[in-house]
């Protein structure tokens, strides 16, 4: 099962790999995908673009199964979108500038609550839904790096993303047991400097996320 926050290219260029590589490695069930409006069309276009590859693997000498390349897509709105024996998933809209359909997700298990911000400027809805979470995974940009940007980029980033100073304020309100930083815009800063900027206004536990580690 996969959950997409929004359809910006930096969040979707790996989508074909997510569909096809596990199938090549013998996944024999469809991939289940939840995402915003537009994900159905994107999925159809990806499958069409790779049509020759799919047909070759199924009809040629490669013994690929005929099921694992399929995708079952649900276009979501806010609220509970998924539940099984292990986890309940709640989607909520976030403030990613003028991008209409951007979501965060709250994952609830028997012993943990994890909130993923997606791409967002400071969001009252995210603050409310993430209060008391075990882990808050939140995007961030360096305030000192931002200060060196041009005015036109400052205007863009301030409406689409969250600074270290703003995130410290959010964490002070929501009080997660762990604040995990992701989608970091460094602009010449280091991981250590990003952490220091947050810790200047927040005393809780904070770590830089490392994908696939």
Which functions belong to the PLM regions below?
Residues 1-115, 193-213:
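Binuclear metal-dependent hydrolase catalytic cores
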Residues 103-104, 111-113, 121-212:
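Cap/insert and terminal regions of metallo-dependent hydrolase folds
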